Each structure stands twice: as C-alpha cells, then as structure tokens.
Amino acid sequence: GFESLSLRQLGEKMKKFLITLLTLPLLLSSYGGMWEPYQMPSLKKELRDAGFYKNVESISNPFEYPMNAIVSLGYCSAAFISPEGLIATNYHCVERDFIQPNSSLENDLFEKGFLARSKAEELQAAPGQKIYVTLESKDITNEILQGTSDETESLERFKIIENNSKAIIRECETSDEIECRVRSFYSGETYKLEKVLQLRDVRLVYAPPAHVGEYGGEIDNWMYPRHTGDFALVRAYVGKDGTSKVYADDNIPFTSDSYLKISAKGVEEDDFVMILGYPGRTNRLLTFNQREYDLSEGFQNYVDFLESRINLIETHTNDEDGS
C-alpha cells in the first residue's frame, strides 16, 4: 500500500532524492544533453557511434535544411512540415492559447479534440500568439561588452550591457514583423544577436482529446514506458503581399521553403534519434566555481526554502488539537 507521510517526512525524502539526482551526471554519457548546431562537428565520432552516418555538416547550420525548418512558439519548439505553413508541435503547447479560447461548455475541445477538415475550418489562436522564424544569429560579444573591463563594478557593468543591448536591438528591428533579441551564453561569456520573423496569424488545425495528448506530469500514472499522442498541428498565415499580418479572413498560408518530411516507415529499436528545438537553458557547461557554489550554498538554500514552505503549510493546516 501507499506509505503515509507527513510533509516533514516527505521533505526528508526529497532531500535524499535531490542528493541522488546530483550523483546521476557522474553515471551519464559525457556527450549527452543539449548542444548548439555549431558544436556538431566536434561530436562527429560520438554521433557516428550513436548511429548518425550522414554528413555532420548537414546538421551544423541553423539556416540550412533541416535546421531552418525548426521554429518557436515563444515558449515551445515546433517545425514546419509542409510548404503551406503547417506546423507540428506538442499538445501542451496549444492548450492555453489555441484550445482554451475556442472551447466552451457546449463545445469542449479538451474533451473531444479538434480537426479542421479544410483551411476555412481552422481556428484563430488567442491574440498575441506568434510563430518565430529565426533569420539570423551572430556573435556580438565585443559590441555588448564595449565600455566594460575586468575592473568594472557589477552594477555599472549591468547598466552598460543593458544600454548596449537596447541600442543594438533598436538598429536591428527595421520593421514591425522583425523582432531582435540579445542572448547571453555561458553566464555572459558570449552574446549573440538573434533576428527573427514574427508570424502573427496562427490557427489551430488539429489537437487530440486531452486524455490522448497530455504528456504527463500528473501525480498518478507518471511513469515510463507510456504511450501518449503528445502532438498538435497549427498553421501560420501572412497577408496577401507575403508580409506578416494579424488575423484576417483573406490572409493566406505562409510559404515555408524548408520543411521536415514525415516518414511513414516509423522507427526501430536502437535507431538514431535527434531532437532539434529551442530549449530554455542548459547547465552542462557551468564553471567549477558555479558548481562549488551550488554544493556549498545553492542547494542548501533551496532545501531551506522548501522547509520554510513546509513549516508554513503545517502551521496553517494543523487542527485545533495540533494534529
């Protein structure tokens, strides 16, 4: 049966669990995890050992096929899968801004799913939903750090970097359909300028029922192996002149020159699989000092924070008799 635990006992078990997690990287492959495209050539041997036999250069340029078929919803990765702007993404990526706004008590798309049998039936996403297509990425470290030195105080350094970033972004954003971002890599070691096209008319094409599409994360039944239809389809539209426009009835599908081709062959056990996308972050290249801080202070501070939350909950949930 299930073990009955108090919040404090649960906290103690979580401590042990966190310690166990800290030891896992020692057991994992040294080349697992997330890598930037330009790093692929340095992994040529490892990729071949893993079963990738094509030219590594073909997955090293984010602006050539197949890399340039990968797009972002701003909070999720996605990919063009047709020349008419059809995009595949995860089910949980369309729940809030595509399914929810188009659902009602009488027409619950979470319960029954949705399929547009023609482009005319595709459903408008919530206002502000966009697809982001990366057009350019370049190193701007020297420009961002201009005016700083090793002696610059932290606050002053932050202000200089912030002002330099704003100036670079203003110069980069030449139209309403272009958005530019300054990204920091390796804890400020390098900076890159990303120039992206914003597609502002996005519509829901297909989503399975929630009981099919939800990927997990629930309290019960969160274990492997499991089978989940965690995917959905949306389509990007533009104005008749081909430029990015907000939703309008006469908008036309975006022409995607690069798109992934879906194989009907499926996969076999031990087939090579690579996931391309826009992950939030990785800590695989933290410095020794950063790891040392985590071990000496960071993790303990987090445990202390969790314990304070447990104490607060217990204080406000005890019965009058203290139980």
Task: Identify the role of each PLM range.
Residues 11-17:
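Positively charged n-region of N-terminal signal peptides that target proteins for export
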Residues 8-11, 24, 318-323:
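Short, intrinsically disordered, charge-balanced linker/junction segments flanking boundaries
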